[in-house]
Regions:
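Hydrophobic, well-ordered secondary-structure elements that form the walls
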Residues: 69, 179, 204, 269, ...
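A conserved FAD-binding loop/helix module that cradles the flavin
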Residues: 272-298
Length: 301
């Protein structure tokens, strides 16, 4: 949430969109001499010789490394390293995602039926719950895992992106609402689940006065998140947040006393994606903590 405050933001929103953070970090890294290899495909990694082979613009390239940090999903590094034992062990974790996202575009600012006198309250987060008890909440969560239900209403978290951008004095052609949805079964794409999108709209539009101003909606299911962003099973946090996969258990290091972020039994390969800390696949928090640990490790040698 604080990332928005750093880059001309407000309560987690970032002026111009969250991708502005990576643009600003890129500027910082370039200024201190970091080299970038964009649009590149890693062919192989030789962990003994500490060499990375990759293709860029159909040309073979090779670079050396002293320390290697992966900010990907947890499985991909094991595949690139061709470490089948480690891959098999990591794949035993629960990667299932049951969250979807709908972006609704309005041609005029959204007007809520239950307004607030507080300044800028239109930009606040909202939660719409479909369950009345914790027991029902749990049943709804499990329903899309154990049964054939494609959608079992749990809650909808509403990001008032359009109102937030107005607070930040950023003019955009449409007013956006983003609905983060629970619970959607992993399997079908958003295009195949139009009835789910319509159900979510039905729930949300009860709270909005000017529903006629909604001109378009885009729906991403867990399957879409897998196909577009390569999350193993459509989980934006890469792994499920459940038993033995929370915070201090969320690592792949065989020597956590040396470093929580070491990857497998490698001495100089690290992992800092959302699989190590549930931060919506943004490696900012884990990247920083991993870098701090690595710096201490280097300084101690």
């Amino acid at each position: 949430m604080d990332s928005g405050s750093v880059f001309n933001g407000y309560w987690g929103y970032v002026k111009g969109g969250i991708w502005q953070i990576s643009h600003e970090i890129t500027k910082i890294n370039k200024k201190i001499g970091v080299h970038f290899h964009m649009s590149s495909n890693i062919s192989s990694i030789d962990s003994n010789k500490m060499k990375i082979s990759f293709k860029k613009e159909n040309k073979n390239n090779e670079i050396d490394y002293d320390y290697l940090i992966f900010a990907t999903d947890p499985i991909t590094p094991s595949k690139i390293l061709k470490n089948k034992d480690l891959q098999s062990k990591i794949e035993d974790n629960d990667f299932l995602g049951t969250s979807g996202k709908i972006t609704a575009f309005f041609k005029n600012p959204v007007i809520w039926k239950e307004s607030s006198p507080y300044k800028n309250s239109d930009s606040s987060f909202r939660f719409i719950f479909s369950n009345q008890t914790l027991s029902d909440f749990e049943k709804s969560s499990q329903s899309v895992i154990r049964n054939s239900n494609n959608y079992s209403p749990g809650y909808i978290q509403v990001y008032a992106e359009g109102a937030a951008q107005r607070v930040l004095n950023n003019k955009e052609p449409f007013d956006k609402l983003i609905f983060f949805i629970k619970n959607i079964k992993y399997g079908k794409t958003g295009d195949q689940l139009n009835h789910v999108k319509e159900k979510v709209k039905e729930i949300m539009f009860k709270y909005i006065k000017n529903t006629e101003d909604c001109v378009s909606t885009e729906f991403l299911s867990p399957r879409d998140l897998n196909q577009i962003f390569y999350f193993p099973k459509g989980n934006i946090d890469h792994m499920a947040l459940n038993e033995n996969q929370n915070y201090n258990d969320r690592h792949f290091s065989k020597n956590i006393k040396k470093s929580f972020y070491l990857y497998g039994d490698y001495e100089n390969i690290f992992y800092c994606g959302a699989g190590a800390y549930p931060c919506g696949s943004v490696a900012g928090t884990t990247g920083y903590m991993c870098a701090k640990q690595l710096k201490r490790l280097i300084d101690s040698n």
